[in-house]
């Protein structure tokens, strides 16, 4: 057993209750494409677990069509904005220890005042992005 930095090496939770340490996270879109290829056999049941530190608001919206995403704030505060597919919107500010769920098909982004760290548990298959 070894200790691993989740910010550097995310975890894939897969079919059959597997947990796979992922290669070094680069933040590039190619990393996510390679991740999808590595775990294609898990389909919509796979989950990517990551932790990110933010010092600025997001410059994109994202949407996960294949499943829910859990956003767990572990430090600081972040304001999560959601645009649901029925046209409604929601906003919630999370502080350390609080979480929210982005339902499948919900566009979401976040604002950060200062800095914040969050853990994401994401059904990433088919994830889309658009400019903010």
Placement of each model-derived feature along the sequence:
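Short histidine-centered beta-strand/loop micro-motifs
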Residues: 38, 58-65, 82-83, 91-92, ...
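Short, conserved beta-strand element in jelly-roll/cupin
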Residues: 65-80, 84
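Short, surface-exposed beta-edge/turn micro-motifs
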Residues: 46, 67-70, 115-116
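A short, N-terminal "cap"/entry segment at the start of jelly-roll beta-barrel domains
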Residues: 1-61
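Short, charged/polar surface micro-motifs in flexible loops or helix N-caps
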Residues: 44-45, 54-58, 75-79, 125-128
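Short acidic-glycine-tyrosine-enriched beta hairpin
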Residues: 84-104
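Double-stranded beta-helix
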Residues: 2-14, 109-132
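Structural motif
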Residues: 77-79, 98, 117
């Amino acid at each position: 057993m070894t200790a691993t930095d989740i910010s550097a090496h995310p975890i894939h939770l897969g079919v059959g209750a597997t947990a796979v340490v992922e290669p070094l996270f680069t933040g590039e879109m190619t990393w996510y494409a390679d991740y999808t290829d590595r775990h294609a056999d898990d389909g919509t049941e796979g989950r990517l677990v990551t932790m990110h530190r933010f010092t600025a608001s997001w410059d994109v919206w994202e949407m996960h069509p294949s499943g829910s995403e859990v956003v767990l704030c572990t430090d600081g505060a972040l304001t999560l904005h959601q645009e649901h597919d029925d046209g409604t919107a929601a906003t919630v500010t999370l502080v350390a220890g609080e979480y929210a769920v982005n339902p499948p098909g919900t566009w979401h982004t976040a604002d950060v005042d200062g800095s914040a760290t969050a853990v994401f548990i994401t059904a990433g298959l088919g994830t889309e992005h658009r400019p903010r």
